[in-house]
Design a protein with these regions (language model features):
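N-terminal alpha-helical "arm" segments
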Residues: 1-27
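Glycine-rich, mobile lid/loop segments that gate access to catalytic sites or pores
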Residues: 118-154
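Long, contiguous amphipathic alpha-helices that act as assembly "spine/axial" helices in icosahedral shell
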Residues: 75-133, 195, 280-282
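Sequence/fold signature of self-assembling virion shell proteins
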Residues: 2-10, 143-182, 189-194, 200-302
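Short, contiguous, pocket-lining structural segments
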Residues: 79, 102, 106, 162-165, ...
Length: 302
């Protein structure tokens, strides 16, 4: 349905001092703090995790050498979604508006809607990361204590007990990440990179990572997290996280959180000869997800 003069009655008459409601500031591309972006030329993308070899055994004198097998462990799949929206203006609404350019006004509003949706889609991967049914290539949720390994063991990228963000829980996460292994149970020397928090935890994050001394104690101990550079990239606030208690760590494990861009944002317009209406649309195709769940650590909070 086209935007007509019926929706813009006040703008057909002189005397308005201001038009407002479409010029609010917006949050930036917060997904870039979490995801690695790659381009895609297919309707979907797949990435397969490989399993190497176990620790080498001792060979006894005169005995045969031991052989091991590498294999594929599992495959993660990214299905791109098409995100699109448009609006239409009647010829008369364009002609009779006394104030500003309707097309310029609403194309800005359209861009805002498209950008907002992208951030919601990106944050949804974390928001649903603890929810059964939102599984990755290994058959479990993004944040799980049972990421099974080819060797028969498991990796966990959640605390043993859901914990609020504090000094103890953050230090425990750093230690836990350092103990992750590959598919054959060899240590992988993983490290945290960045703390990602909702707005409600921004001040907690500042105190934990940026103060010189320990937080909330009467002791004169140093802040070990800051002194050791345990979270080298500091913290980022994501305003699209829905749980005010949940917090996350990105890690240096490669091929973790991925954003595939199938078709970049495209804007177009055309006119209808019969009605005189002018139509505008925006369209893009992308996907958000994860390949290796060890690219993130998460706690749902206590």
């Amino acid at each position: 349905m086209a935007i007509s003069r019926a929706q813009l009655l006040k703008e057909l008459l002189p005397g308005l001092n201001a038009l407002f409601g479409l010029e609010y500031a917006k949050y930036g591309e917060e997904h870039k703090e979490i995801y690695e972006t790659e381009s895609s030329e297919r309707s979907f993308e797949e990435e397969t995790k490989l399993s190497g070899f176990s620790a080498a055994p001792v060979k006894n004198e005169g005995s045969a050498i031991a052989y091991d097998n590498g294999q594929e462990a599992w495959t993660a799949r990214y299905n791109h979604e098409t995100i699109a929206m448009g609006f239409s203006l009647t010829e008369e609404a364009i002609e009779d508006n006394l104030y500003d350019s309707l097309s310029a006004r609403y194309t800005k509003a359209l861009a805002r809607s498209m950008a907002y949706t992208k951030q919601v889609k990106a944050a949804a991967v974390l928001n649903n990361g603890f929810t059964a049914g939102y599984n990755g290539g290994d058959g479990t949720t993004l944040f799980s204590a049972t990421h099974t390994l080819v060797s028969g063991g498991t990796n966990s990228n959640v605390p043993s007990t859901p914990s609020d963000l504090n000094e103890t829980s953050l230090e425990s996460a750093v230690i836990q990440i350092s103990l992750w292994t590959d598919e054959r149970s060899l240590l992988i020397a993983a490290k945290p990179r960045k703390l990602v928090v909702p707005p409600a935890l921004q001040f907690v994050a500042t105190r934990l990572l940026e103060t010189e001394l320990r937080v909330g104690t009467n002791y004169n101990d140093i802040n070990a997290l800051k002194n050791n550079g345990s979270i080298p990239e500091g913290y980022a606030i994501n305003h699209f996280l829905t749980d005010s208690n949940a917090w996350f760590l990105t890690t240096d494990v490669p091929n973790g959180m991925k954003h595939f861009e199938r078709t970049p944002l495209q804007n177009s317009m055309d006119g209808d000869f019969d009605t005189g209406n002018v139509r505008y649309k925006s369209r893009e195709r992308y996907s958000f997800g994860w390949s290796d769940p060890l690219g993130m650590y998460g706690s749902a909070g206590a």
